[in-house]
Amino acid sequence: MLPPRQQPRPGGLQTSLSLVSPDACGSPNPQERGSTSDQARDSPSESASSRETWPTSDALMLKKLEKEKENGYTEHSVVRNISNSDKMSLRDIARERVDVIAERMRNLPDEYLEKFKHELRVILEGLGGAQHREEFLFLQRLVNSRGDLTDGTLIITHRTQLEILVAIKTGIQAFLHPSVSLSQASLIDIFLYKRCRNIACGSMLPAEECSCEICAKKNGFCNLCMCVICYKFDFEVNSCRWIGCDLCSHWTHTDCAISNGQIGTGPSVKNGASSAETLFRCHACSRTSELLGWVKDVFQHCAPSWDAEAFVRELDYVRRIFQRSEDARGRKLFWKCEELIEKLKNGVADPMACKVILSFFQELDVDPSKSQDNDEGGRLIAPEEAFNKIADVVQEAIRKMEAVAEEKMRMVKKARLALDACDQELKDKAREVTSLKMERQRKKQQIDELESIVRLKQAEADMFDLKAGEARREAERLQRIALAKTEKSEEDYASRYLKQRLSEAEAEKQYLFEKIKLQESSRASQSSAGGNDPSQMMYSKIQDLIKNM
């Protein structure tokens, strides 16, 4: 079979789609979840171990839900009331009644609803480590333990509410991506395991009405895009990463088939002759498919479109498939893949490698098979013919020995190259160590210089501090001197001012005295002519007052 589904890869979603198995997404059957708890490792939806601890704030609620589920009445175990707070959390969406949450979401702005989706995307990315993983597992357990999430109740959900519930159940954050717009019916089908959760597939389940045991019993499994061993899907097409069963058309990851022992050497009958070939045993139907022809078909149809990196990756897949092959053609293909990988790593153009591998497949097709001489049975073989057959056997043994020798030489060459690479790496590391030592010495010298500069600056600071103290004391002394001189000058000024005022007062006194005397003399002359006058009495009082001054 050719690689699965030659469909274009959906643009813009590769980073937001994770590989998740149905078990990791939370199967309604607790036994199913426990049986494959170690299979999902690519997203926070991986199953928790028995040592996981749940958040204590909701531990009692979780135990109650589990107990009611065991007793068979989980349909009525949904919490009926939401807290009176205006805030709503992802736990409320996962736990509370559908109609109540839907009604509240219709009254919330779109920006607030986007916050829920962003918060869940952050949890699904798992960047918060164990805390985010535990939070997601707790949300998933809440959703999976509910019995009221049916077609009838999910049809009334708010769009954002339904997207969050589907993302929690599947563990795929693509359902929260702004560019992904699935219908409400499709989201409900995905939630109820009626439709493939792979957005690029979207087939109704069971796909193609398959009635095999895996499709019938494994919830959410799609045989068109999922591996029958790990139950995961991806967007790899035109690749040897997937192996398809020729009989039941189910697909398996090459890595899963190798690790699960589904690839080995077995008998194959072609043209009436029995020979050993590398076979793939399907995990779904337990029947075998031949791998060499499948690899040839993949390379013939898809190799011309591969770049060098993809070509090396595909050759590595083929190399690991035929690594333990015991048939001659499988061993030749294994050696050829190793040879081409080495050449591509050394810079050989990928179109040339494509031509080489395709011509190699043609050589394998025209390689004559061993013929069986059925018509010679029962008769004696001539000596010359016996010698020829012995020679053929010897030639075949020599060819095998040469092939083994070539393989050993290649291994020795690879070991020598690895040794040379190690020696070169040691030399590089030695140079790096020398450089680091020199750098360390230089840094040490710089540190010493900086320390000496710091000490010098500290000494300068101490000196400046000392000078500042002396200057401060000198300023205080000068201030005291200036203050004393100011006080003395003020006293001198006051003394001179008082003396000046006193001399002025004396002069004025003398002037008034002279004036009074003059007036007295004039009045005396007048009084001799006339009697006492009231003004004479006033002058006498003024004279007494001046004398007192």
UniProtKB/Swiss-Prot annotation:
Molecular function via GO: zinc ion binding
Record's keyword annotation contains Nucleus: yes
Subcellular location: Nucleus
InterPro entries (UniProt xref): OBE1-like_PHD (IPR047578), OBERON (IPR004082), Oberon-like_PHD (IPR032881), Oberon_cc (IPR032535), Znf_PHD (IPR001965)
Cellular component annotations (GO), alphabetically ordered: nucleus
One GO term of the biological process aspect: regulation of gene expression
Keyword field: Coiled coil, Developmental protein, Host-virus interaction, Metal-binding, Nucleus, Zinc, Zinc-finger
The keyword Nucleus is annotated on this UniProt entry: yes
Zinc finger residue extent: PHD-type: 224-288
Biased composition (Polar residues): 28-38, 45-56, 521-538
Listed Pfam families: Oberon_cc, PHD_Oberon
Chain spans, region Disordered: 1-56, 519-549
Disulfide pairings: none
Coiled-coil blocks: 394-520
Role according to the record: Required for the maintenance and/or establishment of both the shoot and root meristems, probably by controlling the expression of the meristem genes and of genes required for auxin responses. Involved in the development of the basal pole and in auxin-mediated root and vascular development in the embryo. Confers sensitivity to turnip mosaic virus (TuMV) probably by promoting viral movement and multiplication via interaction with TuMV VPg.
PANTHER family (alphabetical): PROTEIN OBERON 2, VERNALIZATION-INSENSITIVE PROTEIN 3
Oligomeric and partner information: Self-interacts and probably forms heteromers. Binds to VPg of pea seed borne mosaic virus (PSbMV), turnip mosaic virus (TuMV) and lettuce mosaic virus (LMV), but not with VPg of tobacco etch virus (TEV), cowpea mosaic virus (CPMV), tomato black ring virus (TBRV) and grapevine fan leaf virus (GFLV).
Protein name (Swiss-Prot/TrEMBL): OBERON-like protein
Organism: Nicotiana benthamiana
